[in-house]
């Protein structure tokens, strides 16, 4: 299992817009073949910080995800909302 944890920080006045933009990516991603989980998490201590927990069966499923229209649109629309670049950490899932 291929797991990615993405951290995204957005401007104070862009929180609701971020949620709207990411909702479309979430809805498309959970329908993809090979997707096991796609959670959008908001930090209760820092409401402008979000984490995306993505689990796919393998790297090929992740590669496919990055070709989808919902992913490409989301990435494009995120740029002006973020305070800096996204950070990603990749994990190998052992015990889901």
Curated annotation (Swiss-Prot):
Native species: Salmonella paratyphi B (strain ATCC BAA-1250 / SPB7)
What is the predominant subcellular site recorded for this chain?
cytoplasm
State the protein's purpose: Involved in the degradation of phospho-AI-2, thereby terminating induction of the lsr operon and closing the AI-2 signaling cycle. Catalyzes the conversion of (4S)-4-hydroxy-5-phosphonooxypentane-2,3-dione (P-DPD) to 3-hydroxy-5-phosphonooxypentane-2,4-dione (P-HPD).
Which part of the chain is the ABM domain?
2-91
Q: Which reaction does it catalyse?
A: (2S)-2-hydroxy-3,4-dioxopentyl phosphate = 3-hydroxy-2,4-dioxopentyl phosphate
Query: Where, per UniProt, does this protein localize?
Result: Cytoplasm
User: Which cysteine pairs make disulfide bonds?
Assistant: none
Question: PANTHER family this protein is in?
Answer: (4S)-4-HYDROXY-5-PHOSPHONOOXYPENTANE-2,3-DIONE ISOMERASE, QUINOL MONOOXYGENASE YGIN-RELATED
List the protein's name.
Answer: (4S)-4-hydroxy-5-phosphonooxypentane-2,3-dione isomerase
Q: Which family does it belong to?
A: Belongs to the LsrG family.
The EC number of this protein is 5.3.1.32
GO molecular function terms listed in the Swiss-Prot or TrEMBL record: (4S)-4-hydroxy-5-phosphonooxypentane-2,3-dione isomerase activity; oxidoreductase activity
Tell me the enzyme class: isomerase
* Pfam families per UniProt: ABM
> What InterPro entries does this protein's entry cite?
ABM_dom, AI-2_Isomerase_LsrG, Dimeric_a/b-barrel, LsrG
Q: Which GO terms describe its cellular component?
A: cytosol
Q: Which UniProt keywords apply?
A: Cytoplasm, Isomerase
SUBUNIT field: Homodimer.
